[in-house]
Structure formats: C-alpha cells, structure tokens
Amino acid sequence: MFLMTSTPLLLVIGLVREGLALASEYNFGGFEADPACTKDDKIYLVSMYAHFDRGTIDAIFSAFSDCKDEREAVEHYLKSRVIGPYNDYLSKFKVKIGFDAKDYDVNELVPTKRFDSSCELVEPVGTRTSAVHNHLLNTYKDRKIGIHLFLWSCPTHNENIMDKIVIGEPKECARSIGVLWRGTEETIDFIKSGISEAISGAKDLFLNQGFPSPRDEDKLSYVCQHVDTCIASKPSVNGAIIFGIDETSDDAISTHIDVDTHPSDVYIPPQRGARAQRVIYVNEPSDSVDDECKY
C-alpha cells in the first residue's frame, strides 16, 4: 500500500483548496449563488437625498436645456444617467435606490454656510461634505438624516482635490457622499462608486467604466447588512420595504414613501410649490408635461 508523507499530503490539500477557491470565484461549475438580500417577494428601497452646488446646477441645466427648470434637469440627469442604470445592476440584490432632489440646491439646505469657490484655500470635496454632514447631524437631534449625495464644482481640477468621499457614522445609518463634478459623463462612475461605498463599504467600484468583477461584487453584497440594519417595514428617512415586487420586472416601482409619517426630529425634504413630497423612482411618470429633456 502506498503511503503519502505529511509534506506532499499538505501540498495536495493546499492545491485542492486553491482550486475550490478559483472555481468559486470564476464559477467554473456553472453554479451561481443567489446574491439577493431576501428570498421574500419584496425589495429594499434605499432613500438618497441629492444636493448640488450652483456650478453643478448650472452645468446640468445647460446640458439638459429642454428641461423646464433646474430641478427637472437635475432629476432627469440622476434618473436617466445614474440611478436607472445603477438600479438595473443592483436589482440582483433585491435592493434599489430611490432619490429625492426636492432640496437640490445645497445653498438653500445650509444657507449659513459659505464655501471657498476658488477651491484653493482648502481641499473642497472633503471639507464641504464634512461641514454639511455635521450640520445635518447637529440639526436633527436623533441624527436620523439618511444618505445624502453632494455634487461639488470647482473652476479648476488638480491632484490635490479628491474625486469623492463617503462620510459615515459608526453603528448608524447616516451617510454623506461628496463627489467632484467632472461633467455629465465622467461624473457618473464616481457617483455610482460613492453610493456603493455608502451602502456596502466597498471602495472604488465602478471606476473602470464597467461592472465590478466577481470578487468586487462579493464586496458589494455587504449591502444586505446595510438594508437589514437600516431599512424597516415602516417607511423612514432611510427608505422602505416594498412588497409584492418582482425584482426581474422592468415595471416601475410606483409606491410613494409617505414622509409625513416621519418624526419631526429626522430629515424631511421641504415642500416646494404644488408638488407633493415623494421620492423619485426610476421610470416613474414625471410631474412635467414634457418629460423628454434632451441632451
């Protein structure tokens, strides 16, 4: 009988383990684990509140000049260029992003804050995002502010200006994403990357203008921990659980979150004009008669 010594045996065991790891990573066996965060007939809707500085607002409104006003332009940009494609990818986790841009002008969100428009005195993206994040935390006593996206513009770009930053609170659901505006196309991947980091902790995904690799996608699966912790059955500033939705369907999620049920100590976007408070959903009919903002 052939006896294998301990050293070759350990070598074989190591090779087998390495082979199994490779097979799992590259799906050699054709088996693909379901990444969904739930097996139930429901989707986790993560609310995100979007804000832009004046330079970014002007740039987007100029690029989408057929939109009737600034708010419609920024909503159209996020809806068609960023959140729509991102949700198509995120749907495998049974998670979607619903964005709210009613409070789109950051100068109205924090009217007392004045930032260095030259972007030369201090690093702008981190400094501005941190300042507004702390302002929101200090304004709402229970620190329930949800996830906020801030797009910042600068007259010039240099290596000392960071492309994005994500600020979070330990063991809390509050997040602030700061992104440097680089134009309607180049900024998209940085926004997707910032959202991914805010909801999963995975850094620098989507920055290669493509989808994450299988290994990186596994990092994004930590979104399940975020929604399990932050999204409850009752709608809140963090989002809501939408029941009876087929994750493979292209139909719009039309259920509105009733933010009027939120406690007064959480962030609630202001009512503006005749529009009801709501979250914008991908493919949801617009309030505008002309929804085709041309680029």
Curated annotation (Swiss-Prot):
One of its GO terms (biological process) is sporulation resulting in formation of a cellular spore. Its main location: other. Keywords: Signal, Sporulation. The keyword Transit peptide does not apply. GO terms for cellular component: spore wall. Residues 1-23 form the signal peptide. It is found in: Spore wall. Belongs to the SWP7 family. This is Spore wall protein 7. It comes from Encephalitozoon cuniculi (strain GB-M1). The gene is SWP7.
